[in-house]
Structures are given as structure tokens and as C-alpha cells.
């Protein structure tokens, strides 16, 4: 997907709650759509076409009053390259090859925030996570709105797997943590 974005200039996003995302230093950076619909709309902007790969069209999480449920801009053409019953990786590789997309793509550089001191805030929790996360850690993220800084603070951490909520207030942290152990 990163190769295709490089070749076409497209914006690349992971869905709000990807099942698992391999992240960290030495890996391509794939920005997740933000949980809050107004921020997700800013990320998507005025896109005129959207290609989905093993993901539904972006939608706001709850039916917030006065906010649209669909995050697809009006007039935006939506196409599906591959679904979960297809082989999404093979479909992406075939499209990248068809486009003559470069093999080399930008990778996250190793970087960690300084271990913070002082008041406990969403920013200092994110910085602490980024400073301390070990290689090949499995992070089970149930943060939703308070985790808004986690992605940036951990982007250059050692490679790790990031598991997210199934959506909303449905907690999955304990079962996922037990399964990961």
C-alpha cells in the first residue's frame, strides 16, 4: 500500500480500529484514521476517490448529533480492491507492480521521546509508552480519545504489534492481554 501511495501521491490511511498493525522503526508509516469524526474528516479532506482494501468505507463511530455518519466526502468515488475473502496483500502487490511503484519506501526512523516527569496527562502517558516500549511488544490499545498522542509517540519505537478495540466501549484488553501472554 505504501508503494502505491508513493507512485500515485495518494494519502494512505489504516482504518480507525485495525485488528493488528505492525509498527515501529524500520517499518513503513501508515497513519490511522482518527477516532473523532471531525479530525478524520480533516485527514480525508476533499478526496475525490477512495480505494478500500480489506476495510469498510470510513464512518463516524457513533451517530453524533449534527455530524454525518459517513466520512466519505460527497461526490467521492469509492472502489474496493480486495475484501477479507480475497488476498489483500497479493492484490496490493499486483497493483503496485502494475503501476511500476518503487520498491523502496520511506521507513520510520528509530526515535523515542524522552521519558517524561511531572504531571500525568495523555501526552505524558503516550511519551512514556514511546520511551519504554520493548521490541516485539504487543500493545493492546483501548484508549480511544485519550490515546490521541500514542501513534506519534510510538512511531519510531522498536518494531511492535498494535491491537485495537473492536469498536466503541466494548472492552477487549483483558482477553487480548491474556491471549498475547
Per-range role (PLM):
Residues 1, 33-40, 44, 84-92, ...:
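Generic structural signal for well-ordered, non-membrane alpha-helical segments
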Residues 11-20, 101-113:
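Amphipathic repeat-derived elements
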